[in-house]
């Protein structure tokens, strides 16, 4: 039987018809913003490509360390246009890979050092928000990963045991039984959950615009509507109003994440995977009371097809997930931001996990690409001979990691005496993705296999051995 409020064709069949096709986060910041474009020529100390969190945090920390330097950020659209302004609003200390998975690549000590630095990043971001007066609805309520079927409980507890075995503390990751989980939020089905305190909720668009305003006050140039055509040693070639231009720079930092395939240097460094979201109307006090989302911890489940949600500051459920197809040749188009089938599946998850909100109207739906490296591992690349650096590889967990890697690349370039220079991501180069059509076949197979395995496990309570082996080989 489907949850109350759902229909045979899904909760979203009616609700999606009138949903605004833009991020709900954009409703909260309507202050005037003047666009400045790049000059046809010029010279700066640091040129940063990408006006998202990676680029803006890099500009921020360079401006603190070298206030006399000229710094410019190139953005093809407007700041916060990409994933930074339309993500799920999680600022999580977790990487896409767990501590035990990072240990397999870098060793135990390096993995634990990376995680300690990432957990501490939330304190750093919070301190900047307070110091700079950036209002973005910052709220630290932690995060839970809930087991919605018994098989997920076994898997989550087994994975948690691996983390504790290498030295991750109970204070950082611990198990909640079903009653403790329901004390966090009144989920329809839970067999317990992994909890971490290292996660905050934010309005990411407010956060990115707030940071941009601070940068302007600090004298950083933000050049929007100025797409970069090519990166050369010490030169950024761009177009503004259809006219070519070139700006020289002592250092060029590429911070383009999901849009990296459009550059020659990073054609196969990442694939742009689309993550889509919906948001409900503000929920009534009665529904909120039934949900008992007490600390506003973020939510995900233990399935392979990622789903993620938060209760926003104004009482909405903002929920998203993967499942939209990868497009041949790593193509990115505005029309890909909307996918009815995927949005419908995400909207139905509200009724499945949060039945009291099953009748809530869907007011917004949106999506966008995020960058995924072949090994799901972040990296900081510094090439002094080419006056070039690059950061990225967040695999959807970038709101905190962008800050960490921005501080790292600044410390590395300036050769600061900093523990961040011991992070294993410095100099790490992920393998390139396969050429087409192998990439198209492989990535979309991963998406379909993940969905198929989740469906089989929910129906039978058992994991399909052949499909599970296939997906592990593809990864």
Task: Locate predicted features.
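Flavin-dependent oxidoreductases
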Residues: 231-312
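Glycine-rich Rossmann-fold phosphate-binding loop(s) that bind the pyrophosphate
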Residues: 50-54, 76
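Glycine-rich FAD pyrophosphate-binding loop
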Residues: 63-86
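Dinucleotide-binding Rossmann-like beta1-alpha1 core, especially the glycine-rich loop
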Residues: 94-178
């Amino acid at each position: 039987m489907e949850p109350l409020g759902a229909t045979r064709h899904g909760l979203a069949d009616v609700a999606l018809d009138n949903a605004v096709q833009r991020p709900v986060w954009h409703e909260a910041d309507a202050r005037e913003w003047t666009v400045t474009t790049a000059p046809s020529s010029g010279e700066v100390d640091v040129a940063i490509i990408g006006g998202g969190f990676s680029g803006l945090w890099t500009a921020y920390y360079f401006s603190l360390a070298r206030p006399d330097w000229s710094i410019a950020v190139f953005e093809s659209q407007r700041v916060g246009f990409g994933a930074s302004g339309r993500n799920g609003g999680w600022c999580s200390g977790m990487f896409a890979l767990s501590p035990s998975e990072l240990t397999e690549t870098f060793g135990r000590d390096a993995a634990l050092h990376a995680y300690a630095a990432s957990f501490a990043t939330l304190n750093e971001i919070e301190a900047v928000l307070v110091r700079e007066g950036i209002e973005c609805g910052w709220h630290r309520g932690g995060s839970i990963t809930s087991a919605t079927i018994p098989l997920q409980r076994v898997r989550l507890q087994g994975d948690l045991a691996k983390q504790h075995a290498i030295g991750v503390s109970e204070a950082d990751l611990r198990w909640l039984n079903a009653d403790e989980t329901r004390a966090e939020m009144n989920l329809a089905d839970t067999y317990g959950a992994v909890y971490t305190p290292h996660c905050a909720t934010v309005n990411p668009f407010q956060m990115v615009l707030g940071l941009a305003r601070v940068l302007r006050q600090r004298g950083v140039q933000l050049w929007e509507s100025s797409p970069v055509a090519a990166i050369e040693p010490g030169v950024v070639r761009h177009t503004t109003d259809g006219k070519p231009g070139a700006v020289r720079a002592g250092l060029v930092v590429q911070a383009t994440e999901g849009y990296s395939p459009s550059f020659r240097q990073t054609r196969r460094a990442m694939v742009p995977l689309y993550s889509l979201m919906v948001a409900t109307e503000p929920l009534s006090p009665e529904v909120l009371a039934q949900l008992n989302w007490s600390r506003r911890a973020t939510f995900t489940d233990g399935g392979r097809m990622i789903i993620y949600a938060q209760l926003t500051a104004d009482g909405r459920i903002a929920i998203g997930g993967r499942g939209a197809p990868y497009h041949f040749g790593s193509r990115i188009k505005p029309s890909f931001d909307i996918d009815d089938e995927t949005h419908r599946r995400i909207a139905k998850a509200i009724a499945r996990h949060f039945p009291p909100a099953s009748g809530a109207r869907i007011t917004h739906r949106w999506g966008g690409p995020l960058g995924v490296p072949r090994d799901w591992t972040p990296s900081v690349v510094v090439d002094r001979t080419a006056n070039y650096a690059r950061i990225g590889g967040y695999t959807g967990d970038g709101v905190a990691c962008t800050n960490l890697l921005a501080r790292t690349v600044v410390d590395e370039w300036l050769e600061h005496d900093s523990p961040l220079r011991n992070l294993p991501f410095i100099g790490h180069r992920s393998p390139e993705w396969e050429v087409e059509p192998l990439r198209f076949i492989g990535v979309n197979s991963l998406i379909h296999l993940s969905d198929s395995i989740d469906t089989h496990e929910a129906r039978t309570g058992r994991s399909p051995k052949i499909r599970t082996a296939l997906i592990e080989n593809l990864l």
